[in-house]
């Protein structure tokens, strides 16, 4: 993809997250993009991300859904305000609630494809629905409630 990922717009002090921080050399460094009204993310688990041979660890799945969904919440908030990502003041979101439904075991060996849509934007809250598929088969669904980071959480 030629465009910048949502996470590449985060200011430095918001770029250290294990799941999505571009400055976390040990992290997952997921990347999320718009595809029309949905956001997309493709992530290939490493062999050590296994629960048992042949299947992806559920905690990793929750982490990827979490970070992709909060990035989507931020991108949607910028869109709702008619702003370009990366403009000041920065809009960054954290997880208030995460519900994950594991529909089928998630196989290793192929990228995880995440597709998210916005269900609601209300004040500081954004509700994001995410579907995770492997090779076209939906394996996991998630619903995340994200809230805008208060200024008190920002280390400057």
Feature roles, as predicted:
Residues 40-76:
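A conserved, well-ordered hydrophobic junction motif at loop->secondary-structure transitions
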Residues 1-11, 104-156:
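HotDog/MaoC-like acyl-thioester-processing domains
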Residues 1-53:
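Non-catalytic linker/capping segments at the edges of enzyme domains
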Residues 26-29, 42, 95-99, 113-115, ...:
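Conserved beta-strand residues within beta-sheet cores
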Residues 21-23, 32-34, 91, 107, ...:
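Sterically constrained small-residue positions within well-ordered secondary structures
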Residues 72-113:
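Hydrophobic beta-strand-centered segment that forms part of the acyl-chain substrate-binding groove
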Residues 43-45, 102, 148:
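Hydrophobic residues in beta-strands and at strand termini
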Residues 11-15, 63-66, 81, 91-95:
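Short acidic/polar alpha-helix capping motifs at helix-coil junctions
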């Amino acid at each position: 993809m030629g465009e910048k990922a949502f996470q590449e717009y985060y200011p430095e002090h918001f770029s250290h997250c294990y799941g999505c921080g571009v400055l976390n050399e040990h992290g997952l460094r997921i990347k999320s993009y718009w595809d029309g009204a949905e956001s997309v993310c493709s992530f290939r688990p490493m062999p050590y991300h296994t629960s048992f041979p042949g299947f992806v660890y559920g905690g990793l799945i929750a982490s990827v859904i979490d970070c992709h969904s909060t990035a989507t919440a931020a991108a949607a908030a910028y869109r709702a305000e008619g702003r370009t990502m990366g403009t000041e003041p920065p809009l960054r979101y954290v997880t208030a609630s995460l519900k994950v439904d594991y529909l089928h075991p998630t196989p290793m060996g192929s990228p995880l494809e995440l597709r998210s849509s916005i269900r609601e934007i209300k004040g500081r809250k954004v509700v994001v629905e995410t579907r995770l598929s492997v090779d076209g088969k939906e394996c996991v669904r998630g619903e995340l409630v994200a809230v805008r980071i208060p200024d008190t959480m920002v280390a400057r």
